[in-house]
From Swiss-Prot:
Gene: iraD
Summary of subunit composition and partner proteins: Interacts with RssB.
Gene Ontology BP annotations: cellular response to oxidative stress; DNA damage response
SUPFAM superfamilies in the record: gpW/gp25-like (SSF160719)
Chief localisation class: cytoplasm
Homology family: Belongs to the GpW/Gp25 family. IraD subfamily.
Location(s) in or outside the cell: Cytoplasm
Protein name, UniProt field: Anti-adapter protein IraD
InterPro entries registered for this protein in UniProt: Anti-adapt_IraD, IraD/Gp25-like
Keyword vocabulary terms for this entry: Cytoplasm, Stress response
C-alpha cells in the first residue's frame, strides 16, 4: 500500500498567521473527509452503510470508531499536536462527531464539528 505524505510549512504563531493556520487545518480536514479519493479508511469517510448494520448505541463500537478516526487523522494531518474525537450523536442515518485539537504553534484549542447527513459530511458550528 502506498502512503501519501504531506509536507507542511508551519507559520509563526502571531496574529493572522495563527488564524490562517487554524483555517487551513479546518479546510484541509473537511477536504479530507469530503474527498471521494480520501486516504482515510472508507468507514471513517463514508461509512454509513457499514455503520447502519451495527448497533449505533454500542459503546465498544463507538470507542473503536473514535480510536480509528483519531489514529487516521493524526497520521494524515501533521499540524495536530493533540486530538480528541468525540461522538456527539450516533443514529442510523446520522452521525455527529466533534474533533477537539491542539495545533503546533497555537496555544488555543480548536474544535471542529462534522455531521454525516444524507450521504455526505457537513461542517457545523461548535456550540
Amino acid at each position: 500500500m502506498m502512503r501519501q505524505s504531506v509536507q507542511t510549512v508551519l507559520p509563526e504563531s502571531t496574529g493572522n498567521n495563527t488564524l490562517s493556520l487554524r483555517d487551513s487545518v479546518c479546510r484541509d480536514l473537511f477536504q479530507l473527509f469530503s474527498s471521494p479519493h480520501s486516504p482515510l479508511p472508507i468507514l471513517l469517510v463514508s461509512g454509513m452503510p457499514e455503520w447502519q448494520g451495527h448497533n449505533q448505541s454500542d459503546k465498544l463500537l463507538q470507542s473503536w470508531y473514535c480510536r480509528q478516526l483519531r489514529s487516521a487523522l493524526l497520521f494524515h494531518e501533521p499540524r495536530i499536536a493533540a486530538l480528541q474525537v468525540n461522538l456527539k450523536e450516533a443514529y442510523c442515518h446520522e452521525l455527529a462527531i466533534s474533533l477537539e485539537m491542539m495545533l503546533y504553534h497555537d496555544d488555543e484549542p480548536l474544535t471542529f464539528d462534522l455531521v454525516w447527513q444524507k450521504g455526505s459530511w457537513h461542517r457545523t458550528m461548535p456550540q
